[in-house]
Swiss-Prot record:
This is Insulin receptor substrate 1-B. It comes from Xenopus laevis. Residues 785-787 are annotated as: GRB2-binding. Residues 466-479, 499-516, 707-718, 840-863, 946-961, 980-995 have a biased composition (Polar residues). The lineage of its organism: Eukaryota, Metazoa, Chordata, Craniata, Vertebrata. The gene is irs1-b. A motif (YXXM motif 8) lies at residues 875-878. GO terms for molecular function: insulin receptor binding; insulin-like growth factor receptor binding; phosphatidylinositol 3-kinase binding; SH2 domain binding.
Length: 1088
């Protein structure tokens, strides 16, 4: 490359400033370039010749001459072919020259820029009137904002690009060849051959920029004049695109550095140039991370930049603002709008972020618009920056790493001092206690992970009154710790319910471990505020309700507050109010409709003020007349709790009472058996027991009442260790201690059992759980039978009529066959050495009193276990008998034709027979232990037997009976629930039998029921065992609330089947089988 000769040496080249060989970028041909300064005859220009010889000899005109005055910008460039380029941008083209090295590039660039600036000074274009874009920004930058800079280049950088019809380019019709012009604060798009900029974008409006290959894009927010969108442009190659990216990024960084806080003197002196307050939306406490995003640095920008041809900025003022940190990841900071939410970032920053009360925070949107602040609103605090924000880009792009810390401190997202930190304020008014947030409340964790002692109630919701003192226990085993009380319910927060500290309490929906496989929540209601520490139960009981049954049941504090409005409370687990005007009775299997005088006088269950009760099988009666109580566990075997009811399937509001159902309405026994062995079977535990057994007139020295539930395989023996949820020992402290017989005093009578937990009982359980065999999927509700072993020493004179005037000792539970039926055995033994099997299917005249055992006879307590052949019955029989120790077998001929032995039967339950049998039958054959069980069911209930037992009553002649169990009537005068199906006849329908197949049993919830309770005279008359004419409509079950007065039946008669007459203070339940097979009916008529 030739160097120009000394201008002074050559007189003819006095205006030449620089000469030399340079290459043309496209053709890469070397040409001789000459840079001439302005003179009186010509302007400063750049010329090139074919070679130096032609230029020296003036043999011809230059190939090209470019006046520097026509160039609106001169920049150094680099591309993939040439790394040292100098580009001159004119109105219609971009002329570039390529140097051999960087020093040569820099020499030429400086010479061109000097001449270009001189030309502007000579023509006094320092006000930018002749500038292409009319922007005053030069190379020196704007040290003082708003002041006119010395004459210089119009833009820091200019790139010639091809705008693509994509994004905003298409929307704004910005397509074709444009010049992308960069200043300190703006980016302008100037169309080729145009004098004015088509679009001027503030650097603060740019969310992000990047490049991909030879494409470069800029994404702007909605605060830009074009709105939110992207500009895509194509350049010569990827090197140019990368250079554009890096250069714009540097400008964005420099812009952020320029707007650091200044002194008050600077702000006051420059108040004519209003600067917006850099603010961002800030929650009163901490915004959620979704509104904070990554930390980015804020920037300010000019809001009054003019187009390249627009001349100087109006009034020489511009407005700037910072971008909110709520922009998405990888975006540039953008200005904070002056219009928006008036909420202050925090109390400590309120004044510093306000322009004398006029500034506002912009909402946390992705974009905000720049609004210049008037000069009169300028304040010293106007320059306080907002936040530390950063951004990244997609592809190869990146954004500026601008730095603009707030005056207090630059907080980092994720720390407690910044909005990124997740605090409780993010979730508003959530009343959740943080203690429970540290533990999992999923059903699995609740069911398998016992919590720490101090956190036992965290996963439960205390819905009791704040004054109550409830015991709490581990949630897995439902076993309370004795003496442990909860005094502050308000400390335990709840979800999806009303306030736990308010009164009356509401029902909470809390999922229990036993319902992890089914629906959502379980109603939890508080129990009685005063509890004996010996009671092994907790303050809460899950009633296993389903979402449609989970109502907010408001309960009153006491029955004194209850006003009788003529309705019966239908809430599950709430006992009826003891009023004499109760015209309705709950029809739910678990609703309590017992006589009111037997209710525990300590405290009565509060009921809803509107007098309604939930008609749901999920309802449960409370053992202590309280609202709810946790299911009790076996005190002797704490592990045998009811923590395994995962097999329970969802059910409707009605319970299947068909023969194929499991035991539900059974009397709550103390030993829940075979729940471990039959873990694969679905358990339908709805605990529809009307009352727990409590003998008011019981004396502690009189004896024990053993009630044990069996699931069909092995009855509870004295060394039983099987799981039990409703095992209880009534009157005795140890269910495993041997039971001794004592004399039965006739003069004593027992009240109707009201609860299963006694004052002297160390463990109680009211909710029996009996396993079922695999049934068809349709019946989803349990059956009604329980093996009740009457072993109560207290059974004195007021004992069952079959037990009257007899020393009552323990009766052995008959060991069941391994495939025995699922009906529960009720084994009520009377110690009588010579008495034959009591009331074994004996049919008596109608006028003969219903008594099972003669007062002068005794029974043997040493009955050997009765074992029969393995037959396929689904239910257990209820056995009541006074067996002699030396009985052998009952001859089959001694049994009545109606006494059906099921030794080879395939029926699903042992039928009760009502045939006439001789009083002197010595024993029963093991093959016909179903007759034994039938006789047990026949003479199951007595006046003073203490427990109410359920004997199966089948009134349906068909094999697909509907099933329901209702509560017995109230001896205090409660009216019976009206029924459309059969009348309330005082005579008990005849007990006939017939095999019923378990698979034939279907679930019918439309059956009606009648409350039948037998008065003393009516039972004594025993008019007929024929079922009433109204009982032919397909019902299976009826609960008989037996007579309320036993005064007329103090004496006992022997060998009578049917239901025994109870005492006036004992109203036991009886579920009697009236399965009317036609041949049995005809036989009964023949005998009559």
């Amino acid at each position: 490359m030739a160097s120009p000769t000394d201008p002074q040496a050559q007189e003819n080249f006095s205006d030449v400033r620089k000469v030399g060989y340079l290459r043309k970028p496209k053709s890469m041909h070397k040409r001789f370039f000459v840079l001439r300064a302005a003179s009186e005859s010509s302007l400063a220009r750049l010329e090139y010749y074919e070679n130096e010889k032609k230029w020296r000899h003036k043999s011809g005109a230059p190939k090209r001459s470019i006046p520097l005055e026509s160039c609106f910008n001169i920049n150094k460039r680099a591309d993939s072919k040439n790394k040292h380029l100098v580009a001159l941008y004119t109105k219609d083209e971009c002329f570039a020259i390529a140097a051999e090295c960087e020093q040569e590039q820099e020499g030429w660039y400086q010479a061109l820029v000097d001449l270009h600036n001189r030309g502007k000074t000579h023509h006094q274009h320092h006000n930018h009137d002749g500038a292409v874009n009319g922007v005053h920004d030069g190379l020196n930058g704007d040290e003082v904002y708003g002041e006119v800079t010395p004459p210089g280049l119009a833009f820091k950088e200019v790139w010639q690009v091809i705008m693509k019809p994509k994004g905003l380019g298409q929307l704004k019709n910005l397509v074709g060849i444009y010049r992308l012009c960069l200043t300190n604060r703006t980016i302008s798009l100037v169309k080729l051959n145009s004098d004015a900029a088509a679009v001027v974008l503030q650097l603060m409006n740019i969310r992000r920029c990047g490049h991909s290959e030879n494409f470069f894009f800029i994404e702007v927010g909605r605060s830009a004049v074009t709105g939110a969108g992207e500009f895509w442009m194509q350049v010569d190659d990827s090197v140019v695109a990368q250079n554009m990216h890096e250069t714009i990024l540097e400008a964005m960084k420099a812009l952020s550095d320029e707007f650091r806080p200044r002194s008050k003197s600077q702000s006051s002196s420059n108040c004519s140039n209003p600067i917006s307050v850099p603010l961002r939306r800030h929650h009163l406490n901490h915004p959620p991370p979704s509104q904070v995003g990554l930390n980015r640095r804020a920037r300010t920008e000019s809001a009054t930049a003019t187009s390249p041809a627009g001349g100087a900025a109006k009034h020489g003022s511009s407005s700037f603002r910072v971008r909110a940190s709520s922009d998405g990841e990888g975006t540039m900071s953008r200005p904070a709008s002056m219009e928006g939410s008036p909420v202050s970032p925090s109390a400590s920053r309120t004044q510093s972020h306000r322009h004398r009360g006029s500034s506002r925070l912009h909402p946390p949107l992705n974009h905000s618009r720049s609004i210049p602040m008037p000069a009169t609103r300028c304040s010293p605090s106007a320059t306080s920056p907002v936040s530390l924000s950063s951004s990244s880009t997609s592809g190869h792009g990146s954004t500026s790493d601008c730095m603009c810390p707030r005056r207090s401190s630059a907080s980092i997202s994720g720390s407690p001092s910044d909005g990124g930190f997740i605090s409780s304020d993010e979730y508003g008014s959530s009343p959740c206690d943080f203690r429970s947030s540290f533990r999992s409340v999923t059903p699995d964790s609740m069911g398998h992970t016992p919590p720490a002692r101090e956190e036992e109630l965290n996963n439960y919701i205390c819905m009791g009154k704040s004054s109550s003192h409830l015991q709490r226990g581990p949630q897995q085993r439902y076993q309370p710790s004795r003496g442990e009380e909860l005094t502050d319910f308000d400390k335990v927060f709840r979800k999806r319910t009303h306030s736990s500290g308010t009164s009356p309490p509401t029902v909470s929906h809390q999922k229990t471990p036993s319902q992890s496989s089914i629906e959502e929540y379980t109603e939890m209601m508080p129990t009685h505020p005063v509890r004996l520490t010996s009671f092994r139960h907790s303050a809460f009981v899950p009633t296993y309700s389903y979402p449609e049954e989970c109502l907010d049941l408001h309960l009153e504090g006491s029955r004194a507050n209850h006003k009788d409005d003529g309705y019966m409370p239908m809430s599950p687990g709430v006992a009826p109010v003891s009023t004499k005007t109760n015209d309705y009775m709950p029809m739910s299997p678990k609703s309590v409709s017992a006589p009111q005088q037997i209710i525990n006088p300590r405290w009565h269950s509060a009921v809803d003020s509107n007098g309604y009760m939930m008609m749901s099988p999920s309802g449960s009666c409370s053992p202590d007349n309280t609202n709810y109580s946790k299911i009790w566990t076996n005190g002797t075997n704490p592990k045998l709790s009811i923590d395994s009811i995962e097999g329970k399937l969802p059910c409707s509001d009605y319970i299947n009472m068909s023969p194929a159902s499991g035991s539900t309405t059974s009397t709550p026994p103390d030993s829940y058996l075979n729940s471990v062995e039959e873990s694969t079977k679905p358990v339908y535990s709805y605990f529809s027991l009307p009352r727990s057994f409590k003998h008011v007139h019981r004396k502690s020295e009189d004896g024990n009442l053993r009630i044990s539930a069996n699931s069909g395989h092995n009855l509870y023996t004295e060394d039983s260790s099987s799981s039990s949820t409703s095992s209880d020992s009534l009157g005795g402290q140890d269910p495993q201690q041997p039971r001794k017989g004592e004399g039965c005093i006739q003069g004593k009578r027992l009240t109707r059992p009201t609860r299963l937990s006694l004052e002297n009982s160390s463990k109680a359980s009211t909710l029996p759980r009996v396993r079922e065999p695999a049934l068809p999927p349709e019946p989803k509700s349990p059956g009604e039978y329980v093996n009740i072993e009457f072993n109560d020493k207290v059974f004195s004179g007021g004992l069952v009529p079959s037990m009257c005037s007899l020393p009552f000792v323990q009766s052995r539970v008959v060991p069941q066959r391994e495939n025995l039926s699922e009906y529960m055995n009720m084994d009520l033994g009377v110690w009588r050495a010579k008495t034959s099997y009591a009331s074994t299917s004996s049919y008596e005249p109608p006028n003969k009193p219903v008594n099972s055992v003669c007062p002068t006879e005794t029974c043997s307590s040493s009955r050997p276990p009765i074992r029969g052949k393995p037959i396929s019955r689904d239910y257990m029989s209820m056995q009541l008998g006074s067996l002699c120790p030396d009985y052998s077998q009952v001859p089959p001929t001694r049994l009545s034709a109606k006494s059906i032995t099921l030794s080879s039967s395939k029926s699903n339950y042992a039928e009760m027979s009502s045939g006439r049998v001789s009083d002197n039958i010595p024993a029963i054959a093991p093959a016909s232990n179903s007759s034994l069980s039938e006789a047990s069911r026949s003479s199951l209930l007595g006046q003073g037997s203490g427990p109410s037992a359920f004997t199966r009553v089948s009134l349906s002649p068909n094999r697909n009976p509907s099933a329901k169990v209702i509560r017995a009537g109230d001896p205090q005068g409660r009216r019976r629930h009206s029924s459309e199906t059969f009348s309330s006849t005082p005579t008990t329908a005849r007990v006939t039998t017939g095999p019923v197949s378990g698979e034939d049993v279907k679930r019918h919830s439309s059956a009606s029921f009648e409350n039948v309770w037998l008065r003393p005279g009516e039972i004594a008359r025993r008019d007929s065992l024929q079922p009433s004419d109204h009982t032919h409509n397909g019902l299976n079950y009826i609960d008989l609330d037996l007579a309320k007065d036993l005064s007329s039946l103090d004496h006992c008669n022997s060998h009578q089947s049917g239901v025994s007459h109870p005492s006036d203070d004992l109203s036991p339940y009886a579920s009697i089988t009236f399965h009317k097979l036609e041949e049995h009916r005809s036989q009964a008529e023949t005998e009559e």
